[in-house]
């Protein structure tokens, strides 16, 4: 056989092999969705129900909230029966009602409630041991709320080694202090900047716990002073997420569900959707909703004024439109909690549309890029944030359209990966989609505030 004939045969064989390979690639069956261990988000409302009835607690549960934080101080006359603190009648009644309605519970330390009711009397040095009354409910207690928004010079009060040692003798759940947002004044967060405020709390409090570490913040982005989102929102979350990552802490973010007063005059499902998605772009594990019940200001004549126009409930205690918006959005994100919670947050990267002026909010977190990930490039028709995650299963990304929800603009975000294959896309209503990457690219159509959680298969 001549050399030329051999070369022709080799060419034919190689060509056939290539065609067969290409055909197999075209006909390759899409992979199945991976399976994940069952995990749930924690959803709770701040300002718990006024009425200690099974009907009231069932209404709370039907909203999608699965945990009750025992705190509510809108009372005309303070008593053990209407304030939640260690040893109060209200705490025991709420635990019993939570048991009946399928809710988990976050106890309230409530030292100042106790002093209010007891005429200035102190808990003493070992409050958790002295009021260790809830052993029968330990299976449903997922945390203890210690304080809301401690100032920088109050952190030491909650970081006392003797207090935390007493706590650890009784409880093996998060010791919860909800921190100020970054827009608080220097009298609240100190003069060294917001990240130092968060880091100081982590160094003084969280490091005393080997596990069950939780960082919580309440940043409400839809302020009355603006028709859009507060420009420091992303930077605040980035600071909290970075400290949480370095300390191995879970993260809890409050979702704004109050309208009027210091907040914008209208909120709807689009704003709830966006807040959940943005928090998830930074690795959220827990979500609080402020407010569930309406805070009240009591007047001298015994009447009261509502603090807001409406919350999840109206001033008369009936469900508002936000109740149903929260219900729908909790169902949406809960549908992929197993997948999302299987991954750990690494960083969040901002993306500005080509030729557009950089949004100041995105500029504040502009130090991150996609190095170290499978993403080569992201192009977007709207401001976008991309949370980058990893686990033993691989990489995942939370892609969020950071456009103002009220503008209701839809745009395309194109994510180009360094390889072909498939991706699972979660976050729309309904079942997740398995999408074949076209030339390594994934296109996502999202309205302002919408997000998609993407895992590479």
Annotate each language-model stretch with its function.
Residues 1-29:
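Gram-positive cell-envelope targeting signals
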